[in-house]
Structure formats: structure tokens, C-alpha cells
A protein has these predicted regions:
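Catalytic active-site module of serine/aspartate enzymes centered on a nucleophile-bearing elbow/loop
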Residues: 284-318
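Conserved HGGG/HGGXW glycine-rich cap/lid loop of the alpha/beta-hydrolase fold
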Residues: 19-78
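Conserved acidic catalytic loop of the alpha/beta-hydrolase fold
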Residues: 88-106
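A catalytic-pocket lid/entrance helix-loop region that shapes and gates access to the active site
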Residues: 127-179
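N-terminal cap/lid segment of alpha/beta-hydrolase-fold proteins
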Residues: 4-26, 231
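Conserved alpha/beta-hydrolase "acid-adjacent" motif
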Residues: 242, 267-273
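Short beta-strand/loop motif that positions the catalytic acidic residue
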Residues: 253-254, 260-262
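Conserved hydrolase catalytic core segment
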Residues: 104-143
Length: 318
């Protein structure tokens, strides 16, 4: 029977910091089998950072599990820094880490913003990708950003009202730019409360059933600041890519297998984006999980992601 539950907790066998453009130093780690098949985990947000549970999607006897925190996120330093922090920079960082670790080709695994970065990386470096495993598709288009900022009120009106009402009434007509202005303010008394309000909103909308623990995990100061500040930075800049670019460039993934795992009731990244991606990416298989929202830890999504990585164990692709 194919495994569908998280693997036991493990610790990294190697950690380090990768120096990229100043002032950024990226935390990275390797766990699992040093001689195993490489897989890189790309976290969401942007800015959310990775957590130890992310190691547990992969069989540690089979996979060489590479995880890193993107610029300004998690354990990378400086936290929340927006200097030279663009999609192209993150793609270049991912490739630099691959080279630094002496990896030829790897599986690329990412959800939400991690799916965006995985697509951007795969389209830039298809020859380095064994396959892309994506969850909760976000294609960085204006309508998807608008949905996050205002559209989710149709499904989570209470969470959205709390999010909007954090701002004065006269600023609620432009939530994104007025949040962004607070989030980039150097004063912690200004940016931290705004970051917590933003992160609480996202956490409240990420699961099909209410999950207070999931919301709480978004509110830890470092997580909240990295997520909210960097996410707003990317959103006000259209994710630093032309409208529709990720879809338009899917042809570059010719020959690269893909699996798209998508919650039917994903309120953060609605299912339509996953369907549109699958329609133009001939090498991809779309798996819609009928009883799930956005989070990778939704039971059905978690199960399907683990099963996907189990299936790839049987593919001899060196």
C-alpha cells in the first residue's frame, strides 16, 4: 500500500548559509539520504519561510531533501529585507544553491508562491528539473492578487472585515498600498501590528475547516513580518513579471513531468488557476482534492503530495 502519511521528524545532516547579493545570506539545509535523489522544497509566501515539518513529505531513505529560506524569509538574513528581492533574484538563488551543493538535477516541490517560483525556475532551467510537484497554484496575475486582497471576503467575510478594518476608513479603498506603506515602515510599532493583521487574514483563509493552530503559526513575529512585508512587496510590483508570463512560457517545460495538487475549495489560490495551467502544460497531471482548501497540511492535500513523491521513487531517471 502506498504511503500517504507524513514521515517521522528528522534533523538535517548539514546546514549552512549561502551568500548571494548583499545584504542577503540564505539559510539552507539538507536532510534524509546524502546519496539519495535530490528534491528541493520551495516555500510559499513569498516570505513565509520553511519549517521542520516540510522535511516530512519525503522518504528520508530515498530522497536528499534540500530546503532553504528565500531572501528575507525565515532563518535567512536580514529578515524582511527587500533589497534586490525579486522573482528573478530568487530563481538565480535557487540555481546557485543547486550548483553550490553539487546537484545535477533535482525534483522541484513548491506550493502557493512556491508553485510560482517552481514554475519560474523550471521555465528558466528545465534541464535541471526531474519533475515539478506543485500545490495551490498561483500564477502571479493581477486578478489573483485582487482576489487575495478583496475577493476572499466572499468566502471569509469575517476574516476580511478584520483585515480591512485594521486600516482607517479612509484607507480601505486601497488595501494593498496602504498595508504596504505600513509594512515597509522601519518602526516596529508600525510594521509589526500590520504584519500580524495581514498574516492572520491569510492564515484564517487557508484551511477548509477552522484551524486555530494554523492561524497562530502565522502570527509569530518573524513569520508575520517576513510573510506580510515580502508578500506586499511582490504584490505591489506585480510579482516582478509581465502579466501572464508563467502561463505563456509553459512551453519551455516541454519534456518536464509535472503533478499539480489542488484543493477544490482553495480560497487563497482558487482552483481555476490550476485548471488553466494543466490545460497548457502537456506534461502535467492535475489532481483536484475534493475536500480541501489551500494549506499543504490539509489532510487530503498532504496525502496526495506524499503519494506523489512515493510514485516518483519508482522512476529510474538519472
Amino acid at each position: 500500500m502506498m504511503r500517504r502519511t507524513l514521515y517521522p521528524e528528522i534533523e538535517p545532516y548539514e546546514t549552512g548559509f549561502l551568500e548571494v547579493d548583499e545584504p542577503h545570506h540564505l539559510y539552507w539545509e539538507q536532510s534524509g539520504n546524502p546519496d539519495g535523489v535530490p528534491v528541493v522544497f520551495l516555500h510559499g509566501g513569498p516570505g513565509a519561510g520553511a519549517v521542520p515539518a516540510h522535511r516530512r513529505f519525503f522518504d528520508p531513505r530515498h530522497y536528499r531533501i534540500v530546503i532553504f529560506d528565500q531572501r528575507g524569509a525565515g532563518r535567512s538574513t536580514p529578515l524582511g529585507d527587500l533589497t534586490r528581492n525579486t522573482t528573478a533574484d530568487l530563481v538565480a538563488d535557487t540555481e546557485k544553491l543547486r550548483t553550490h551543493l553539487g546537484i545535477d538535477r533535482w525534483f522541484v516541490f513548491g506550493g502557493s508562491w512556491g508553485s510560482s517560483l517552481a514554475l519560474a525556475y523550471g521555465e528558466a532551467h528545465p534541464d535541471r528539473c526531474r519533475a515539478l510537484i506543485l500545490r495551490g497554484i498561483f500564477l502571479c496575475r493581477k486578478d489573483e492578487i485582487d482576489w487575495f486582497m478583496t475577493g476572499m471576503r466572499r468566502l471569509f467575510p469575517e476574516a476580511w472585515s478584520e483585515f480591512a478594518n485594521y486600516l482607517p476608513a479612509e484607507e480601505r479603498g486601497d488595501l494593498l498600498h496602504n498595508y504596504h506603506r505600513r509594512l515597509i515602515d522601519p518602526n516596529p510599532e508600525v510594521h509589526l501590528p500590520a504584519a500580524r493583521a495581514w498574516s492572520r487574514y491569510e492564515g484564517s483563509c487557508s484551511t477548509l475547516r477552522p484551524n486555530p493552530d494554523a492561524v497562530t503559526s502565522f502570527l509569530e513575529p518573524a513569520t508575520a513580518l517576513g510573510l506580510a512585508r515580502i508578500e506586499a512587496h511582490y504584490f505591489v510590483n506585480d510579482c516582478f513579471m509581465p502579466e501572464g508570463a508563467l502561463l505563456e512560457n509553459v512551453g519551455r517545460l516541454e519534456g518536464v513531468p509535472g503533478v499539480i495538487v489542488q484543493g477544490r475549495y482553495d480560497a487563497v489560490c482558487p482552483v481555476v488557476s490550476a485548471v488553466e495551467l494543466a490545460e497548457v502544460w502537456r506534461g502535467a497531471r492535475l489532481q483536484i482534492v475534493t475536500d480541501a482548501g489551500h494549506s499543504a497540511m490539509e489532510p487530503g492535500i498532504r496525502s496526495e503530495l506524499i503519494a506523489t513523491m512515493e510514485r516518483f521513487k519508482s522512476i529510474d531517471d538519472t
